[in-house]
């Protein structure tokens, strides 16, 4: 379910209340975050793309909030998850985004990936962006995986890879943080708990899958 509200301070306060203190924003400066011309969209490599609990994009410099959530959701033969959550909060010079889900069960080309909880956060303040992620109880084909917390920790799987705490910087400095990104060439590209913040705007998605 997706909810939008143009109310500014009231909605931002309500969203922070729902998060229950999970998000801790850095101090806001006085300079304006002014977006440069938008870069063009990137065409998906695979045929179909599905987004679960996606906020859409909040324009940079907008004082507003977008959120999306779901109790359970899934993509047949690919993924299931519970307690899906995504939020993007904007201020004149700051954007904060967060995405999460619980009870992840993902199967990509015969590789089974599970996690108790997956979350990412991205924050951009006056053009400088930082991101973090958290993964609890990760396993691949039933084998527990040590999550180091380092950016772009990569684990090989048949035909592809799983990247943990993936952090990508777009040409304009916008930061994209994918807590877990599973790719099998020509089969599926699945980002779990994806948060974006920067000049290109703010957005969050519990899941984005191309297959």
Where would I find each of the regions flagged by the language model?
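Extended, solvent-exposed, non-transmembrane regions
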Residues: 25, 29-211
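Sec-dependent, cleavable N-terminal signal peptides
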Residues: 1-31
């Amino acid at each position: 379910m997706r909810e939008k509200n143009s109310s500014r301070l009231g909605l931002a306060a309500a969203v922070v209340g729902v998060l229950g203190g999970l998000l801790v924003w850095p101090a806001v400066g006085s300079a304006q975050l002014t977006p440069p011309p938008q870069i063009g969209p990137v065409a998906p490599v695979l045929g179909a793309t599905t987004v679960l609990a996606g906020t859409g994009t909040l324009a940079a410099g907008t004082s507003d909030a977008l959120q999306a959530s779901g109790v359970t959701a899934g993509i047949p033969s690919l993924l299931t998850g519970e307690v899906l959550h995504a939020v993007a909060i904007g201020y004149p010079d700051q954007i904060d985004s967060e995405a999460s889900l619980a009870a992840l069960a993902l199967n990509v080309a015969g590789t089974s990936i599970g996690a108790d909880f997956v979350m990412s956060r991205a924050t951009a303040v006056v053009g400088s962006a930082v991101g973090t992620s958290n993964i609890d109880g990760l396993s691949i084909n039933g084998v527990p995986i040590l999550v180091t917390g380092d950016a772009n920790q990569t684990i090989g799987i048949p035909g592809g890879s799983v990247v943990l705490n993936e952090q990508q910087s777009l040409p304009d400095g916008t930061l994209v943080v994918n807590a877990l990104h599973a790719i099998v060439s020509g089969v599926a590209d699945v980002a779990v708990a994806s948060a974006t913040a920067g000049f290109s705007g703010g957005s969050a998605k519990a899941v984005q899958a191309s297959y």
